[in-house]
């Protein structure tokens, strides 16, 4: 079990460090900034690379919503759910803390949103709570369907990390303007702790929407689509 939890810790660490790091350090870099597309690709690449690296150990969840979805679908024992969540959140917090230290090394640094999520005045595009809730539930549900489908016995072997990574990239392309992309409660928690905004006051929704979406996605796959 320790090996699985370590894999989830380091996998989630890499997701936050690489994905949020790209947003904090590189997205708006003068003239050469990577923008929304670069950040979206970074998140997808973190999952793709670590799924290949440690997916065989823990399943490569790196996300409490994914772990819940796989539990509902019968892919993860219920007794492992909370330990997975703890490892994922700790990995996210560790990565966010190190990113904060690195970013604060620049003159004139201001924590600001620190790649945190939000709705209303914390939404990159000024979207409402209802808009954020709806898009995150839908996107998380489809993310779970992608994961369950690409890792099923019916899917071509060896390609699941690619499908999952590109799926997460697409999710970010759609939702960065709306919420800065939640779908992962651990990622949301890690950066919210260090953001100089009201992100913590909205953190409850960063958990509720992805977890609801995960359950919906698992039910859809298991009841309507799943054949494995």
Swiss-Prot record:
Residue(s) at site: Selectivity filter: 43, 172, 181, 187
Catalyzed chemical reaction(s): H2O(in) = H2O(out)
TM annotation in the entry: 1-21, 23-43, 82-102, 129-149, 154-174, 205-225
Annotated compartments: Cell inner membrane
Pfam families registered for this protein in UniProt: MIP
GO terms under cellular component: plasma membrane
Predominant localisation class: membrane
Claim: Thylakoid is one of the keywords in the record: no
Positions of short motif NPA 1: 63-65
Keywords: Cell inner membrane, Cell membrane, Membrane, Repeat, Transmembrane, Transmembrane helix, Transport
Classification via PROSITE patterns: MIP
Cystine pairs: none
GO molecular function, one term: water channel activity
UniProt keyword Cell inner membrane, yes or no: yes
Entry membrane topology: Multi-pass membrane protein
Record-marked site positions (Involved in tetramerization or stability of the tetramer): 20
Entry's family note: Belongs to the MIP/aquaporin (TC 1.A.8) family.
PANTHER family documented for this protein: AQUAPORIN TRANSPORTER, MIP17260P
Quaternary structure and partners: Homotetramer.
Function: Channel that permits osmotically driven movement of water in both directions. It is involved in the osmoregulation and in the maintenance of cell turgor during volume expansion in rapidly growing cells. It mediates rapid entry or exit of water in response to abrupt changes in osmolarity.
Database matches in NCBIfam families: MIP, PRK05420.1
Written domain comment of the UniProt record: Aquaporins contain two tandem repeats each containing three membrane-spanning domains and a pore-forming loop with the signature motif Asn-Pro-Ala (NPA).
Name of the protein described by the UniProt record: Aquaporin Z
Annotated organism of origin: Brucella melitensis biotype 1 (strain ATCC 23456 / CCUG 17765 / NCTC 10094 / 16M)
């Amino acid at each position: 079990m320790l090996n699985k939890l370590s894999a989830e810790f380091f996998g989630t660490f890499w997701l936050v460090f690489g994905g949020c790091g790209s947003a904090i350090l590189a997205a708006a870099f003068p003239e050469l900034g990577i923008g929304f597309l670069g950040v979206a690709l970074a998140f997808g690449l973190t999952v793709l690379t670590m799924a290949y690296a440690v997916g065989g150990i823990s399943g490569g969840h790196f996300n409490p919503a994914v772990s819940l979805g796989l539990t509902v679908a019968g892919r993860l024992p219920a007794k492992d759910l909370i330990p997975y969540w703890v490892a994922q959140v700790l990995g996210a917090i560790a990565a966010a803390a190190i990113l904060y230290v690195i970013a604060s090394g620049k003159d004139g640094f201001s924590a600001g949103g620190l790649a945190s999520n939000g709705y209303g005045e914390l939404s990159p595009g000024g979207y409402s709570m209802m808009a954020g809730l709806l898009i995150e539930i839908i996107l998380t549900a489809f993310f779970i369907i992608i994961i369950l489908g690409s890792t099923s016995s019916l899917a071509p072997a060896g390609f699941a990390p690619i499908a999952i990574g590109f799926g997460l990239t697409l999710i970010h392309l759609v939702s960065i303007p709306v919420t800065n992309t939640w779908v992962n409660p651990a990622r949301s928690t890690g950066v919210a702790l260090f953001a100089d905004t009201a992100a913590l006051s909205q953190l409850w929704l960063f958990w509720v929407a992805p977890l609801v979406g995960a359950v919906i996605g698992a039910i859809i796959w298991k009841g309507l689509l799943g054949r494995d």
